[in-house]
Amino acid sequence: MMVFQSFILGNLVSLCMKIINSVVVVGLYYGFLTTFSIGPSYLFLLRARVMDEGEEGTEKKVSATTGFIAGQLMMFISIYYAPLHLALGRPHTITVLALPYLLFHFFWNNHKHFFDYGSTTRNEMRNLRIQCVFLNNLIFQLFNHFILPSSMLARLVNIYMFRCNNKMLFVTSSFVGWLIGHILFMKWVGLVLVWIQQNNSIRSNVLIRSNKYKFLVSELRNSMARIFSILLFITCVYYLGRIPSPIFTKKLKGTSERGGTKQDQEVSTEEAPFPSLFSEEREDLDKIDEMEQIRVNGKEKINKDDEFHVRTYYNSKTVSENRDGNKENSNLEFFKIKKKEDCFLGFAKPFVTLVFDYKRWNRPNRYIKNDKIEHTVRNEMSQYFFYTCQNDGKEQISFTYPANLSTFFEMMQKKIPPFTREKAPSDQVFTCWSLINEEKKENLQNEFFNRIETLDKEWSVENILEKTTRFCHNETKTEYLPKIYDPFLHGISRGRIKKLPPFQIITETYIKNNIGGSWINKIHGILLKINSRKFEQTLEKFNRKSLSIEEKLSCFSEPQEEQNNSEEEIKIFKFLFNVVITDNNEQTFIKNLIYFDEINKKVPRWSYKLISDLEEMEAEDEQSILAEPGIRSRKAKRIVVFTEKETHNETFKENQSSDEKEEISFIRFSQQPDFRREIIKGSMRSQRRKTVIWEFFQAKAHSPFFFDRIDKLFFFSFDSFSFDIWGLKKKILRNFMWKNKTIYKTKAEQSKIEEKKRLQIAETWDNVRFAQIIRSSVLVTQSILRKNIILPLLIIIKNSIRVLLFQIPEWSEDLKDLKREMHVKCTYNGVQLSEKEFPRKWLTDGIQIKIIFPFYLKPWHNSKFQSSQKAQRKKAKDTEKKNDFCFLTVWGRETELPFGSAKKKPSFFEPIYKELKKRIKKFKTKPFLVLRIFKEREKFFLKVAKEMKNWIIKNFLFLKGKIKNLSKRNIIPVFGPREIYEVNETKNDSIMSNQMIENLSVQKKSMEWTNSLLSENKLKNLIDRIKTIRNQTEEISKEKENLTNSCNKPRYDSKIIESSKKSWQTLKRKNTRLIRKSFFFIKFCIEQLSIAIFLGIINIPRITTQLFFESTKTILDKYIYKNEENGKKINKKKTTIYFISTIKNLLSKKKKISYDLCSLSQAYVFYKLSKMQVSNVSKLKAVLEYKICITSFFVKNKIKDFFQEQGIFDYELKDKTFVNSEVNQWKNWLRSHSQYNLPQIAWARLGTQKWKNKINQDSIVLNRSLTKEDSYEKKIFDNYKKQNFFEADSLLNPKHNVKKDYIYNLFCYKSINSTEKNLDMAIGIALDNYLVSCFLEKYNIRGRRKIGHRKYLDWRMLNFWFRKNVNSEPWVDTKSKKKYIKTQVQNYQRIEKITKTGVANEKNFFFDWMGMNEEIINNRVTNLEFFFFPEFLLFSSTYKMKPWVIPIKLLLFNFNEKKNINKKITPNKKGFIPSNAKKFLEFFNLNKEEKESAGQGERESDNEKKKNLESALSKQEKNIEENYAELKIKKHKTKKQHKSNTEVEIDSFMGRDSRFQMRWNSFFNKKIITTLKVYCFLVRLKNPNEIILSSIERGEINPDILLISKTLPFSQLLKKGMWVFEPVRLSLKNDGQLIIYRTIGISLVHKKKNKISKRYKKKSYIDKKNNCDFFVPENILSPKRRREFRILICFNLKKKNARDRNSRFDKNIPNLTTVLHKKKNLDKDKNNLIKLKSFLWPNFRLEDLACMNRYWFNTTNGNHFGMIRIHMYTRFQIH
């Protein structure tokens, strides 16, 4: 039953698979997919369904649907029908046909009177609406689809058509599938429209219901046709906009440009004799005409130089001669017929090429060119060629059959009848073929098993492995042929044989030595170029008549040309098929065989030769330019760097009019992006899609897909409107956390911004048309105006004013300075020429005018007032930094760099103001010398003033008390003493509890005086009487109320009356009280006013003295500061000195404040707070009112009462709820005081230590036990933290705190190659040089390289973060000897590493070395280098952890290095001018011949010591250089032979190293450019000695940089690291074995480098017995035999049983396992996968599948699939 069920399931599955793979289902699927290819035709279809109504509307719907379906049916038929496919599949055909119809339709809908739109009958012929609707839907369906392009579907259809048998069924089923999808789509659209009409909620929102918009809606409905036409026009223009117009392009010049060149004759003559008749490569009629026209007229166009190349074809005599003597040339007749047809169809040919040449109208798109090839390849030629061949014993069609072989086979069949024979039956051929293969297979199997058996016997592996078959000279001597000449080898190992030069004279000895002993094919001797007379002498045994020169190709004639003499035929054939001549004595025959042509395939190329714009610029003479440039190069300009004029005799000058100048020039490229891309002028090109340029100056075009990863917000980026999101975020966070910190841009960032602005300005001037002409003329006029008008006028005005002010004029000094100013003409980049010499084409290319020693107007020259020592030093420093040159701008201003910001001129009036200030100061110092004494005795004066003040106040209070006592003895009111006593009674407690407070002393004495006046008895009696009266009145009132309540009920009016009575009574009571107390109130106010007036009078001298002291203090501070050299500035905003305040004692720096704040008593703190001035207390009032509510639980009640009585805060607002005891009770109080207001750094120290734990986690290495030094340093670091972290005096040592804070943050965030100088962390303070050096010394970061016992550095130790890929390098300042860290981004707008912006919780990723780190988890953007080849990721990670693996650079070069230890001496520099300045002066005094070869001796600076670079080239690269040098020498023979020495030197240098990218160091870059610019200017001068010293003093010339020696020591420059040569990727001539070794060597361990130290012995085990691991047993065989063995096994795979196939193999299974799996533990699944993948390649023929891809162009061999073969095999274990 189970078997039956499985059988049913198997049948169902197979049935389903058959249905799915059937032609009908696949066709329905592809047809349904084409429904989603929505194009412009859907606009017409929807318009007809939506807008049209009525009877005519239904007709339009039907016609639109019919036309739509008919158009799609034509598209499907074109898949099967080839002519229709050629017509519709070529897009330009549809474009040419659709454009007129589109314009017609557009104007028809927009023009009112073009057709009559009135009501017409159905039978009228003028009503073309329905027909036009049908045509619209039919034609626009044939267009290329708009939303979803149909190229993908067309490719899928073509692939399925290639492997489908029933093609018509496939086409019909796909059309049916499309029809079903279209019906469903239209039904869905209809349902949506009905739903919109029925849904009231949607219709209510539409404006149609309102009467206000009915007119607009009707207008909209009437103009829908126009709207649809506009939409259609926009879509079609968008489609057509991607293709430029083919009409307005540059045409070729016809045959004159296509023919007549040397290479064209080579193409026409070296191909097969009849290529156009049999080859598919000559399909195009126009190309046939071109080739035939060249061949017919070939003899007329032969030049003297072309004779050698053309004689190959014409000496072989294609013209065959009959026995009658009539010459016949079938090709010639064919050419004549074609010529007549061309004359007949004179107009048809250009029209056809214009409309139907869909690939290129006029010229190709690219022009492939190098040193060997100077003609572009015809990209119309395809390498697909179908022909029948025998495969697996049967005839099959091959689509990669060689076309030349097929044509040759057809020629042999037609021309030689004896070669044709009857074909054998297919079965017989198959059986013979299978038997041969079986025999081969058996032999291979036997050999394979024998090798395995010998391997079991423990033979050496070298003897068992099969070696490649080589060709030997003799059987006895095992001497192999060289690899180049070995026929059994193929590929790169064969090498390249250098051709002999065409006109080289070859002697007989050379022939005997080289060719005398070699074997030569006779067929080559007959068919190739041979001297006919000497050849006939060697063939005397044959009949000369039968083998004459005219008839030597007669055997290839037509079948009707029969030969009479059969014996002669037999002799000829015997001679032809005796392949080898063994007689070496036939010297005449051998001599003529020197000119063998190399057998290769000639690629069809265009005949014309084009040059680029760059070649036109680089051309030396105008005569060398043959034609106008035809290739658009990148925008560039030619800059002349050096001009040399040869001196001649006077007699020679008379004869010759002008001397020619030899120039050395370079090409300057624009900073703009290059969109020309070496495209041929006039060729059709497609626009670059998916690239956007939103900046005016942008280095590279970026895709909008990566727009979210760019920091810019807008699509434009001007410097004034740019918006940096991340920069703004940093600023906000930094301001939020640190309000006191100022944000400023560093100098490096500012310089980058200015550099970018300069480049933008330079590019705008260079790009705007006629801008350079305007700018150059304005600059010249500005220099003339400045030198001749403006500056002399200023000199006249200045000296005339001096005369008016009775001062001596300075005419001579000013004119001398003006004469010193020089206006040097420079190129656009700033290269100096001379003062009078203008650069070539300066109007169009641009000019710069450099002003040397610019003139600045000064009020006087020799100052009469001598400056101090400090001022003189400052002046000397300014002169060192000052550059005595500038560049002139268009506005007449000065800049330091071309197109830079304007330079600030030294002010004319500033020295005048300074001189006036000095004189005023000198005048002030004389009368105020006494103030110095007051300054010294300031404390004494303050104490005396304070004591006087206290004495006056005490006396005043005493007098005031006496006066009050005398006044109180008079009339005393009744109620007055009683009130005073009550007040005294309430305040006695507070006075007794706070006797220490001095502010209450006045009140206390006054109260005591009043208490002595009254006696206690009187007061008691009065109080008793008042109480009895009050009690009586209350009793009477209660009785009255009871009587009224019992008699009458209360009314509403009565209540109002009672309330009003009560309010009136209280008012009356208060008035009486006021009247009673008014006397005392007035008296109290008078007393307070008198006291205030008296105190003010007393304070007048105090205020005046205080102001006097303050003014004198400021004056003395200024005076003392300016006279003392090392004095520090005193803060002008210092707080005022209060005599009463005692806070000054708390703020003394000598005392230490501990962290334990509990030691302070509350009474002491609040007492000191109460002693503060009112201004300070007022600031704290709001804080105290709020904070005491929180901390009221901890504050004593007496202190609260005191503050409440003083009026600082209201006691009733206190919250008496319990507060959490964990809250720091003093924290909020102490924040309000300056001395306790701790900075954020200190609070961070007192807080948690999360960030410190993060530091410790980051610094942990995976294997902690590797180093002892690391752990030792860690312990020191931890102990240091424990000792210094909670120091008591750390708050009072700000320098130490800041230093510690920098150290911790540097350890966290700062890396060696960080891109920012400002640390992006919590503090945000720039690093101090001292702190960095202290940090490096203290924590021994410098000593990391001194780890001796660790053999290899683990890169996971370095937990640094990188934001961009930058080139950073350490540099040393020779003056300060402090280490800095400097980073520079050298590539302009280069996006090296993509970082996702805007992600929440953004993390700093781990250091991604080479993009291969395995620990990156959250990184969204993966490394794209290993996206396609993930297998290499594991290789790279193991390589990083085990550096002894064979390095990857071995795949590129073979380094042959020689390490030499050179002792380098760096002499100390003394003096202002360097020690080698004398050599530099001597250098300029040399002759002209010595100037070119002079340089400097070997010397090295401190910076150069650290950058020593060893560079070496491999032997293979040197061979490549020699080959290219030979080619260049040949190429430049036609150019000028007489060159100057400088040109020869530069050509030789560039010829040797032109294949290398040359770059220099950044430090070397800035200095060398400045020195070179000055050097170019100095070379032109006659006497440069005067300017050399000044330029050396100013620092423009650094003599250490210039190399003063007779030869250019490039090796020393390389070692010093100034110059670095990076090799360009070139094709290396490596052996096949070397490539295999390098490929396998990546995953293997090198024995020499894997030296195991003692500490690693316990961790790993190495198997010494097993030398290698076999991937597959087949690896014993050679690769060629292995492939053959696999293919032979896989033949007849279905017929063989498993037992038969493995019968021989099963016997040896145990032995095989012992060989392979002894002491190995490989997984079984992995082994099965290995076996599967090893046999997958030959079984399923992946070459054929890969060729079906769209990348099949130009792939004739399987080299492109080599990487696929490599990646099919998995990586194995390394033991």
Swiss-Prot record:
- Report how it sits in the membrane: Multi-pass membrane protein
**Region (Disordered), start-end ranges:** 1491-1512
| GO terms for cellular component | chloroplast inner membrane
Q: What is its main location?
A: plastid
Question: Where is this gene product found?
Answer: Plastid, Chloroplast inner membrane
Q: What are the record keywords, sorted?
A: Chloroplast, Membrane, Plastid, Plastid inner membrane, Protein transport, Transmembrane, Transmembrane helix, Transport
Query: Is Transmembrane helix among the key words of this record?
Result: yes
Q: Which residues cross the membrane?
A: 19-39, 68-88, 91-111, 133-153, 176-196, 227-247
The Gene Ontology biological process terms listed for this entry are: protein transport
Q: Which residues form a coiled coil?
A: none
One Pfam family in the UniProt entry: Ycf1
- Describe the family membership recorded for this protein in Swiss-Prot or TrEMBL: Belongs to the TIC214 family.
This protein's assembly is summarised as: Part of the Tic complex.
Q: What job does this protein perform?
A: Involved in protein precursor import into chloroplasts. May be part of an intermediate translocation complex acting as a protein-conducting channel at the inner envelope.
Q: What else is known?
A: There is a partial copy of the N-terminus (positions 1-343) of ycf1 in the inverted repeat (BAF50598).
Q: What is this protein called?
A: Protein TIC 214
Q: Which organism is it from?
A: Lobularia maritima (Sweet alyssum)
Gene symbol of the encoding locus:
TIC214
